Structure formats: structure tokens, C-alpha cells
């Protein structure tokens, strides 16, 4: 059994949590708490600051073998094996706010990791020889003997002794509930030109940091360990649209069609554009998570069409075209059957999607023989798997030992299913 549906379907909890509204507006640079910088440029700054001179960021193609089979004295070899894939939801910056005993605490425990756990996972996969690659480089479109379009797996050339890894990040939208539950809530560009985040600490102080969010932590880790990303890849954002993107309220509202709402929406659209540009410049890419985080296994074709058009209009128009869709709830379309190439799957293909990503117990992938598409699964480091049985721990053992990762001192007292290490 490749897929672990019971825990996936339970993720509907997060959708119910994420009711949208106006996000609180922090004054960037007002600082406090664990801010990693004394100042940063807010999107709402009264005057446009002088743009800093950014260090060049090199993105190279892992499908091209380096001249002479080596680069910077490091041999590169062909990789035709499995490309592993881990995905995360937003990481918890302040566990004391996330796990405060309210109705959301257990759901957050299930589906999230803390900043400390995320840092340990990155360190572990780095030490185990994984390197980051762009999900878009794993498969490409070709033609078969009859001239029909087909997807093919590409050969990657990686440093000898290294193993390719894809990271993806669901719901990087900064839903309004997150501010009260210990998450950061917006990406911004700092005075140094780099990506930072805004948030609030448990005392209510506004904090600008690079140490409290999955995006900025990974950026920082790659700066400190450039060999972790020899091609410049970071991760792929899996975005919905119903609460805007990246902390900016770019969405239309059925309940509010006023001129004031539209004016604010346009302001948010302009504010997020430089964020998107900097993310793209530094190796981040984008995929669809549907506009409304809809369950593709149960929705009608007409609902999927309307949702997809809204995603294209409100998200794709900002982040650019993508051929990747990440299934909400891990639920495949047309009855959640991996073998189906039904009308919803075909419609999504017609809109440019070629890589269809679900969630499972391995980095499974299959090139479909009846159409030009790839289906794949991702593994999910989170509370459900960190607390899991010895069997579940085995699914992740090539990346880390969950017993070394989970921080039971900050999580709810819900127990674990694995066998403790021998003392």
C-alpha cells in the first residue's frame, strides 16, 4: 500500500481553521523578541528605499553533465534512481502559542513541525548526503515513436556520493489564524534585499526574523552550506489562493466586491510582486494547491473548472505558469483512484499540468502510459509521522531518526508509538 489515506484525509481540519479576513499589519522594523535584524523594509514603507546590491545567485541545470565530468574539482555522476521528496506545512515558530490547549492544538500537532524540529531535519538530510534539486528538472516532455507527447524521467548529474532531494511546502499563504497560533504571517524584503518574515512573539511584540519560518531558515541554511544546493534549487511552494499568497491578501471576495476591497487587493498585488521575484531569483518555484484547497476526489468537474480558473487568474497570474499541481488532502481526482485518467484529470492536463503530486509513504512516482503526465507521492514529516510506530519510523530512516527529531518537551502530551532507543 503506497498511500496512507486516513491521516491525509484528516488534514481537512486545517481548511476549516483557515477562515480568511484582513491580516494584521505589523510595522516592519519595530522589532522585538528574537528578531535577527535591527531593521527591514516593510511593503508599506512611506518612501521607496534604495535597492541594495545583491550577491549574484547562480542557478544551473542538473540535466547537463559538467565539462570533463567534474565541476570545481568535484566529480559528477549520472543519477537515475529515486529522487526523494519531503514536504512540509508552515513551521511552528512559537510552540507555546500553537499548543495552548485550544481546539486547534491537536491538529497543529498532527500536521506541523516546530522550528527546532525543522532545523534538525535539514541538518540530518544534509549530513546524510542529500542535495536539493528542482522538482521541475526530474521529468520533461518528449515524444514517442508515433510522435505523441509523453513524459520522460531525466538523468540528473549530481556530485559523486550525493543523493537528490526535492522539498515542497504546502499552504505558504499565511492564513489569518496563524498569527494567533505561533506562526509567522508574511514574507517581506529586508534592507539587505533578502527575504525576511514578520510575526509576533508570545508577548505580542512584532518580530522580523529569518529564524522562524521554513522559507527563510532554508535560505539561511543554503547560504551557510552552499554544497547542499549545488544547482541553486530551494523548494517548491504549493499555493492556494483563497486567502491570497505569501501573506498578501490578493484574493477576490465573493462577500465583498466593494471598490475599497479591490483597491486594497491591488495594493497587495503590487506589494507581493517583488517578493515573488526575489524568491524566483534565489531558486524557489511554484505549484498549484488549487485555489480553494478543494478535495479533487469528490468535487464535480464544473467546480474544478471554476476553481482552476480562479487559481490561474489570482495566483498563476502572479507567480507565473507551472506544470505541477499538489493535491489538497492528498486526494486524487476522479474518485481518488491512482489508475484513473478521468475527466477531471484530463481537464487539469488541458490547463498545463503534467506533474500530479499526492502524499504517501514513499517517494513513489509513475509515468502514465495513456497520457502525458506523471503521478507521484511525497513523504510528510509532521507530528503524525514523528510520533508514529517503528514501521512509520522506517519510512523516514533514510532521512532522520524521528526519535532524535521530535521535541516532546513542547508538544502536547499525546504519547508516541515507537520503541525508545536502547540506553
What are these regions (language model features)?
Residues 1-7, 21:
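Positively charged n-region of N-terminal signal peptides that target proteins for export
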Residues 9-14:
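Hydrophobic helical h-region of N-terminal Sec-dependent signal peptides
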Residues 48-135, 151-167, 178-179, 285, ...:
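C-terminal active-site subregion of NodB/CE4 polysaccharide deacetylases
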Residues 78-97, 101-278, 282, 333:
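Active-site beta->alpha N-cap acidic-glycine motif
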Amino acid at each position: 500500500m503506497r498511500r496512507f489515506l486516513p491521516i491525509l484525509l484528516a488534514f481537512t481540519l486545517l481548511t476549516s481553521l483557515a477562515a480568511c479576513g484582513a491580516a494584521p499589519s505589523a510595522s516592519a522594523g519595530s522589532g522585538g523578541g528574537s528578531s535577527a535584524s535591527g531593521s527591514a523594509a516593510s511593503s508599506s514603507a512611506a518612501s521607496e528605499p534604495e535597492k541594495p546590491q545583491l550577491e549574484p545567485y547562480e542557478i544551473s541545470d542538473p540535466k547537463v553533465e559538467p565539462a570533463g565530468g567534474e565541476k570545481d574539482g568535484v566529480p559528477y555522476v549520472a543519477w537515475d534512481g529515486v529522487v526523494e521528496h519531503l514536504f512540509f506545512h508552515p513551521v511552528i515558530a512559537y510552540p507555546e502559542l500553537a499548543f495552548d490547549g485550544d481546539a486547534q492544538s491537536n491538529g497543529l500537532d498532527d500536521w506541523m513541525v516546530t522550528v527546532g524540529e525543522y532545523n534538525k531535519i535539514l541538518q540530518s538530510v544534509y549530513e546524510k548526503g542529500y542535495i536539493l534539486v528542482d522538482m521541475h528538472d526530474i521529468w520533461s516532455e518528449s515524444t514517442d515513436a508515433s510522435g505523441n507527447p509523453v513524459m520522460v524521467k531525466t538523468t540528473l548529474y549530481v556530485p559523486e556520493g550525493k543523493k537528490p532531494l526535492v522539498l515542497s511546502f504546502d499552504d505558504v499563504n499565511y492564513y489569518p489564524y496563524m498569527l494567533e497560533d505561533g506562526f509567522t504571517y508574511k514574507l517581506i524584503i529586508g534592507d539587505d534585499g533578502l527575504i525576511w518574515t514578520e510575526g509576533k512573539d508570545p508577548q505580542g511584540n512584532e518580530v522580523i526574523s529569518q529564524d522562524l519560518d521554513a522559507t527563510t531558515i532554508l535560505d539561511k541554511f543554503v547560504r551557510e552550506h552552499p554544497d547542499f544546493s549545488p544547482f541553486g534549487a530551494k523548494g517548491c511552494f504549493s499555493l492556494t489562493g483563497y486567502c491570497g499568497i505569501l501573506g498578501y491578501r490578493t484574493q477576490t471576495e465573493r462577500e465583498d466586491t466593494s471598490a475599497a476591497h479591490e483597491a486594497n487587493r491591488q495594493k497587495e498585488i503590487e506589494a507581493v510582486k517583488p517578493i515573488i521575484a526575489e524568491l524566483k531569483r534565489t531558486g524557489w518555484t511554484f505549484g498549484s494547491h488549487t485555489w480553494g484547497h478543494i478535495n479533487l476526489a469528490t468535487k464535480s468537474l464544473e467546480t474544478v473548472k471554476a476553481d482552476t480558473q480562479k487559481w490561474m487568474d489570482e495566483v498563476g497570474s502572479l507567480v507565473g505558469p507551472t506544470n505541477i499541481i499538489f493535491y489538497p488532502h492528498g486526494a486524487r481526482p476522479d474518485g481518488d483512484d491512482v489508475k484513473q485518467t478521468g475527466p477531471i484529470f484530463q481537464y487539469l492536463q488541458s490547463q498545463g499540468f503534467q506533474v500530479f503530486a499526492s502524499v504517501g509513504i514513499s517517494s513513489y512516482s509513475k509515468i502514465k502510459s495513456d497520457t502525458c503526465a506523471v503521478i507521484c507521492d511525497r513523504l510528510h514529516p509532521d507530528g503524525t509521522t514523528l510520533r508514529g510506530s517503528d514501521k512509520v519510523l522506517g519510512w523516514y530512516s533514510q532521512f532522520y531518526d524521528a526519535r532524535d527529531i521530535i521535541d516532546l518537551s513542547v508538544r502536547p502530551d499525546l504519547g508516541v508509538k515507537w520503541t525508545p532507543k536502547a540506553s
